Amino acid sequence: MRRPKKYESGEATQYISRRAALRKLQLSLNDFRRLCILKGVYPREPKHRRRAQKGSSEIKVLYHTKDIRFLLHESIVWTLRDYKIFAKKSNRDRAIKDFRNLKRRLALFPEIKLDHIVKERYPTFIDALKDLDDCLTLLFLFSTFPSLHLIPREQSNLCRRLTIEFLHYVIASKSLRKVFISIKGYYFQAEIKGQKVTWIVPHYYPFKPQSRQEVDFKVMSIFVEFYTIMLGFTNFRLFHGLNLAYPPQFPSSVLQDSEESLKDEASFVSDRIAALNFELLRTDKVQEDEEELDIDMELLEQDGDSKRIIKMKQEAQEVSRLRTLFKGLKFFINREVPREPLVILIRSFGGKVSWDSSIFAGSTYDEGDETITHQIVDRPSISTQYISRDYIQPQWVFDCVNQRQLLPTNKYFIGETLPPHLSPFVDSKRDSYIPPEEKALLDPSLIETHAQSDDDSEDEAQEEEETVDQELLDAQLQLAYQQETAEYKKYGGPDGVNEDEEDPEDEDDNEDDDEEEEELDEKTKRLQEEKQKMSVQSGKVHKVNKRQVHKAEVDEHRLQARMVKPRHRNLFRKLIREKQSKEKEEWLLRKKRRTIEASEKEARKTAKREARKEAAAAAAKASKLGK
């Protein structure tokens, strides 16, 4: 039996370098990169790099050997090789100026078909939905790009069409759950087939070309090439699940014979689809969403009353209320407000929305409509206002969705300082600082209580002080009254008669008073005895030595650090640093919050003092005038 040589088995045979993979596949680096992106093959990090690289200490890009063997049997490899042949022949035709043959070759340009790769990477529809986050974020980004050197116009238009179709599904299914505005853009989260899909829609700013090529648009364009095919399959399946016609179409009531529709019906329909403001054509007229929800509730009611079932019932009831949050409300969007995100939100929750017809096609009513309940404005003032509607800032719509209820509009009026816009995507069970506004977001019953807690505490303290002062004043008055009565009895009545010359009736009264005083003394003695019986003995205070506790914690931490394996020490140190930074950040946030609250409390106290002084001065002035 032959003795195996070194690096012929084990980890050395499990990995292959990128250069060896290029030689094995006979592809260029760009083609290999494109093939790996389309097939979902990515570099790997071995446990022992030196063994995997057969003794070499040089850092190389490594792949699994089985992944490269998997790529050998891919039909796209032949198409990529055909590209090389096509490039050589087309260059030859250009050189000899054979334009007739060149035109024929361009018509036979080899195209890559990715349908089988989508089915291969996502065997089930749920697998595709799980990987939809990055797909939607990238396609929404590319839908805002103009025609660039490495991004053709057709690709941007295709991204725009597919993302609009997906938004139509979200609106029709009412599957939107969370929203948030950040510097990056608008965060949306929808629940589709039980899977939470989160994506980002960028802000609508004019495109600014880059001076330096910091972003590799070519690699991103390859990802977009795959994701467009994937989202096309997903949209087709989602639309047919809701009995919607695909590609999206409108009912005949929308396509009325107007000059605009008769001139160019295709552009008319595409503009109305992009407006997101019309119902799409259904293959059947019955909407089964509410029926399915009722069936689910009946199934839940048939089960037991366990905590899990109760929680699921509550969540189902909240979702059913959320789906009709804006039902019966009519919104009008001003021209300075971003149209598309608000249209998605309002229509996803049952509301009606419109805008100025000069901004974009698809408006259904004008600003002068008297049935409008809310007008969304993002400017400090507006010239003409209607009494029958509320003028609110855009954040009101987002906060209502996150808190799953219609909030009061007084905090969101024109010119008002808006409340903090908190993210609903953070973990509520995390061990870190949670501001009171976020607690109110998690528990709607605390929305107003955290704002009034300081005022209530101040009022209670003030009431306690007033009651204490009143009790002291009553005690002093009672003592003074007793002293006066004693002196009165001792030195004589109103006629100047001494105690020695008193009548027998007065003597009887004095005897009665003495008896009452004796009874009071007996009561006080009895109370003192009861207090002595119920007295608590003084206990011993257990003093904690903070130095010893800190030393014990440090020793325990050092012992944990010693027990960590050498290869995991860097990871352990990294985790400790992250923990320390989180604790420091939490401490700083708490300190900042305390200073802000203390300054606000002091300002409120000074304002109250000034108000009391003014009221006292006004009362004194009024009393002088009255005299």
Curated annotation (Swiss-Prot):
Its GO biological process annotations read: maturation of 5.8S rRNA from tricistronic rRNA transcript (SSU-rRNA, 5.8S rRNA, LSU-rRNA); maturation of LSU-rRNA from tricistronic rRNA transcript (SSU-rRNA, 5.8S rRNA, LSU-rRNA)
Q: What is its main location?
A: nucleus
Q: Which UniProt keywords apply?
A: Coiled coil, Nucleus, Phosphoprotein, Ribosome biogenesis, rRNA processing
Q: Where is this region: Disordered?
A: 450-469, 488-566, 595-627
Basic residues bias spans: 540-549
Compositionally skewed regions (Basic and acidic residues) per UniProt? 522-533, 550-559, 595-615
Renumbered to this chain, the Low complexity biased-composition regions fall at 616-627
Coiled-coil positions = 582-625
Record-linked InterPro entries: BRCT_dom (IPR001357), BRCT_dom_sf (IPR036420), PES (IPR010613)
Could you tell me what this protein does?
A: Required for maturation of ribosomal RNAs and formation of the large ribosomal subunit.
Family assignment?
A: Belongs to the pescadillo family.
Please state what the protein is called: Pescadillo homolog
